[in-house]
Amino acid sequence: MSSAAAATRFIKCVTVGDGAVGKTCMLICYTCNKFPTDYIPTVFDNFSANVSVDGSVVNLGLWDTAGQEDYSRLRPLSYRGADVFILSFSLISRASYENVQKKWMPELRRFAPGVPVVLVGTKLDLREDRAYLADHPASSIITTEQGEELRKLIGAVAYIECSSKTQRNIKAVFDTAIKVVLQPPRHKDVTRKKLQSSSNRPVRRYFCGSACFA
């Protein structure tokens, strides 16, 4: 598979969420299969990947946005034309969890009403790391049950927990986002189980643009 020109459809997927929750790490792990060791705050960036789904190829445009307040006026410019949002929070940060409902959903509803949202809890490895939690007493873990409750509260189509460091469920995050666009849920209250079952079909990736070639 050579280029985006071979794709039969373009899907714009935008990642949003508080700064430092791991949005960029998640994108880099998905496109490059590696975990970045240095933290560099994102302003705006994008990646492109040709993805083979059920025998047809779609061009997946991945848009990374900055969560800092300094970019609140510019960030919505990235929302135009979005097909799906990946809304992320850290599983060891209650503030980022609470901001999903207080900050991010109101912003998405204002600038991109009706666009489906996949809710993602990041840094799963740290939530399970007792040594890390002992060294960082200010951390406040979010349970899977709390994540599911938030998904229902905001009307997200799916909830997935992942770790960029271990790459656990990273592929599932983007597979689910793709399937949500290609196979929209018939009912708003679709279960995560149904989406994950659909996401189990083979998905192949061919990276281009500013993404790493894997």
Curated annotation (Swiss-Prot):
Top-rank taxon: Eukaryota
Intracellular or extracellular location(s): Cytoplasm; Membrane
Residues that hold GTP according to the record: 17-25, 42, 64-68, 122-125, 164-165
GO terms under biological process: actin filament organization; cortical cytoskeleton organization; defense response; establishment or maintenance of cell polarity; regulation of actin cytoskeleton organization; regulation of cell shape; signal transduction; small GTPase-mediated signal transduction
One Pfam family named in its UniProt record: Ras
Summary of subunit composition and partner proteins: May interact with MPK1/MAPK6. Binds to RBOHB, preferentially in the GTP-bound form. Interacts with CCR1 in a GTP-dependent manner.
Name of the protein this chain belongs to: Rac-like GTP-binding protein 1
GO molecular function: enzyme binding; GTP binding; GTPase activity; protein kinase binding
Gene name of the encoded protein: RAC1
